[in-house]
Amino acid sequence: YVKGGTVTTDAAGGAGLFAYGDGTVYAADTTIKTTQDTSGGIHAAGGGKLYAWDLNVETDGESAAAIRSDRGGGTMVVDGGTYTSNGVGSPAVYCTADIAVKDATLTANGSEAVCIEGLNSLHLFDCDLTGNMSDLSQNDSTWTVILYQSMSGDSEVGNSTFQMNGGTLTSKNGGVFYTTNTESDITLKDVDITYNNDNEYFLRCSGNNNERGWGESGANGSDCDF
C-alpha cells in the first residue's frame, strides 16, 4: 500500500508501481514519473491486481503506457487522477487485462489514446481521453483507439471490449476507432467527441497489411459490434 509521496524511475523496464501474479497494489495520492522505454506508470501482469486513487502519473519513454498491462493480464481499477504518456507507442492505457477507470484525465501526447489487445476489456466512466498518434510508415492507418490482436502472445485471442460512458474523447491525428484481426465490442454513451481536421474515419473495421504482422493478410479482418 502506497499513500502520498513520489515514485520515480530511470531505467528501461522500470515501472512505477507493478502488480504481478498473486500480488495486489493499493495506491492513493501519489505522484509517479518514469523516463525510459517500457516503463509503465502503473502496471499489472500475470494476474496481478492494482487499485489506484487520485494518482498523478507521467511517462516519457517508448512502449511506456501510463496505465499498462501485459502478458497474463490482471485487474486494474482507477478512480480519479491524471495519467499522461509522452512517448511513441505509449498509449494512455494499454489493455491486456480487465481495466476500469472513473473520473480520470487520460492523455497520450505521442501515441494513440487506447490500445486493447485480444480477450480483454476497458471501461471508462466520465473520463477525459486524448490521443495524438503520429503517422508511421509501418502502419496502414493512424488511429486514436485500437482494438486488435497482434499475435505476439501477450493476450489470449478473443473478443476485445471498449466501453465509454460520459466524458470526452479527443482525436488529435488520424481516425478515431480502428479494429482489426479480432472480434470487438465498442459501446459509447453520452461521450463528447472532438475530431481533428484531417480525420480519416470515425470507425474502421478491416483487415490490415501492418508490417508488424497482425494476422495473415486476407484473413485478418474484424467482426465489430458498435
Name each region found by the language model.
Residues 1-10, 18-35, 44-62, 68-86, ...:
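Surface-exposed loop/turn motifs in large extracellular/passenger domains
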Residues 14:
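Blade-loop segments of beta-propeller domains
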